[in-house]
């Protein structure tokens, strides 16, 4: 039986913040199984994560991480750090390497002493700290093309949001397993903020208006 899978997720570091973005389509073979799939989760006050791959495996990981983050806070009175959270997940995945979780994970967070942090993890527990950006899922090759061409480490949060959405939009236009809207989170020293549909629509609307203006200018020049 086919499992629900297929997605595009993006994570990037910008001016003192981490931005995570995902699409909302879950596919089962060639069938679109869910048009409102949740792939972006808040783990703690300063940590969020994205999932790609087998939905059941990914959701089990999300539940485990949320529980561990709460236990850590109960025992220590502090929030777990993004690095500790990523390392914990790496250990969980590696311990199950003979029967791996079929998923790719991005963990983004804000360390109050060390700034924004971004990590990517593979199904066997391999963990990479990303200094710029990362992407996972079936649409990631397309998203990477946009990120490689336009990313700037010093970009503002608004610019970072627009780039993440542009990378997702490009992937959704070419990858049949990605689509049906987006979810976005911004993580700063103030904590995790999940953007509303209205805020996302506004950002996408601004990009569309700029694109129309550019195309109009090109037409005028060609005339």
Curated annotation (Swiss-Prot):
Subcellular localization(s) per the UniProt record: Cytoplasm
Reported regulation of activity: The formation of the proteasomal ATPase PAN-20S proteasome complex, via the docking of the C-termini of PAN into the intersubunit pockets in the alpha-rings, triggers opening of the gate for substrate entry. Interconversion between the open-gate and close-gate conformations leads to a dynamic regulation of the 20S proteasome proteolysis activity.
Gene Ontology terms: biological process: proteasomal protein catabolic process
Propeptide residue span(s): 1-6
Protein name: Proteasome subunit beta
Main location: cytoplasm
Active site: 7
Quaternary structure (record): The 20S proteasome core is composed of 14 alpha and 14 beta subunits that assemble into four stacked heptameric rings, resulting in a barrel-shaped structure. The two inner rings, each composed of seven catalytic beta subunits, are sandwiched by two outer rings, each composed of seven alpha subunits. The catalytic chamber with the active sites is on the inside of the barrel. Has a gated structure, the ends of the cylinder being occluded by the N-termini of the alpha-subunits. Is capped at one or both ends by the proteasome regulatory ATPase, PAN.
NCBIfam families: arc_protsome_B
Keywords: Autocatalytic cleavage, Cytoplasm, Hydrolase, Protease, Proteasome, Threonine protease, Zymogen
Record bears the keyword Protease: yes
UniProt KW Transferase keyword: no
């Amino acid at each position: 039986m086919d499992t629900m899978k297929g997605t595009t997720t993006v994570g990037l570091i910008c001016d003192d913040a981490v931005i995570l973005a995902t699409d909302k389509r879950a596919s089962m073979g060639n069938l679109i199984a869910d048009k409102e799939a949740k792939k972006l989760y808040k783990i703690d006050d300063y940590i969020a994560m994205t999932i790609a791959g087998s939905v059941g495996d990914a959701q089990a990981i999300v539940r485990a991480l949320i529980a561990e983050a709460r236990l850590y806070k109960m025992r220590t009175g502090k929030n777990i750090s993004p690095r500790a959270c990523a390392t914990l997940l790496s250990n969980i995945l590696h311990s199950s390497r003979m029967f791996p979780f079929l998923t790719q994970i991005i963990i983004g967070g804000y360390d109050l002493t060390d700034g924004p942090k971004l990590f990517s993890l593979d199904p066997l527990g391999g963990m990479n700290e990303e200094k710029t950006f990362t992407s996972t899922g079936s649409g990631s090759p397309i998203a990477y093309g946009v990120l490689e061409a336009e990313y700037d480490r010093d970009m503002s949060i608004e610019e970072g949001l627009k780039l993440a959405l542009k990378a997702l939009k490009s992937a959704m236009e070419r990858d049949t397993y990605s689509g049906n809207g987006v979810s976005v989170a911004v993580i700063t020293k103030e904590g995790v903020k999940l953007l509303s549909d209205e805020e996302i629509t506004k950002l996408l609307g601004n990009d569309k208006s700029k694109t129309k203006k550019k195309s109009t200018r090109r037409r005028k020049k060609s005339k």
